[in-house]
């Protein structure tokens, strides 16, 4: 099923409209649900003390995942719209939803009993990573709503989601995860410029 394109989006090849809608719904949730705020979804410029070094290390590790796919032969050439889209939208839309909304809500339910390298986390991080991997690995839904998930298409997003989830817990903000997500999206296209 595809959302009909509204004026301004009709001639674009990338899913700008869908990503903007995805990025907007956490803000609707903030407006409608008591107890959910900009800070609780990680839309804050205040980071936990000591956040920078471990976050940079984690995000560099996350960049290794698409780098491995490039080494294994993945290539992707982009036009200007593709570059703009990958540098802005996927991380913004997906991190606000998965790390901004799902992970904190699941943390409320399950708590954060574990600690790793200065970040407290729990089942919220793990479940969110599974949901994220499933949404990225989901390649087909037929009219009877039978879904097909391609495992190899879900593994890299699962690993990236674990890292992004940890960064979200370590920093109390979605912004480093948004940045890392968008950066990881351009590793293969950037490396493809030189092949």
Spell out what each predicted region is.
Residues 1, 25-26, 56-63, 125-131:
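Alpha-helical transmembrane segments
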Residues 1-33:
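Alpha-helical transmembrane segments in multi-pass membrane proteins
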Residues 49-58, 116-121:
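Membrane-water interface at loop-to-transmembrane-helix junctions
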């Amino acid at each position: 099923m595809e959302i009909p394109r509204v004026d301004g989006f009709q001639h674009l090849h990338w899913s700008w409209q869908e990503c903007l809608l995805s990025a907007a719904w956490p803000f609707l949730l903030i407006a409608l649900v008591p107890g959910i705020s900009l800070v609780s979804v990680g839309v804050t410029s205040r980071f936990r003390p000591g956040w920078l070094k471990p976050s940079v290390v984690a995000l560099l590790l996350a960049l290794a995942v698409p780098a491995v796919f490039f080494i294994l032969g993945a290539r992707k050439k982009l036009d200007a719209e593709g570059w703009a889209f990958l540098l802005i939208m996927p991380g913004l839309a997906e991190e606000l939803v998965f790390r901004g909304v799902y992970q904190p809500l699941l943390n409320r339910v399950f708590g954060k009993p574990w600690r790793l390298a200065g970040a407290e986390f729990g089942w919220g991080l793990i479940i969110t990573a599974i949901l994220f991997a499933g949404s990225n690995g989901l390649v087909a839904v037929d009219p009877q709503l039978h879904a097909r998930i391609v495992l190899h298409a879900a593994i890299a997003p699962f690993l990236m989601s674990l890292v992004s989830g940890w960064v979200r817990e370590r920093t109390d903000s979605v912004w480093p995860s948004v940045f890392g997500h968008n950066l990881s999206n351009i590793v293969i296209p950037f490396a493809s410029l030189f092949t």
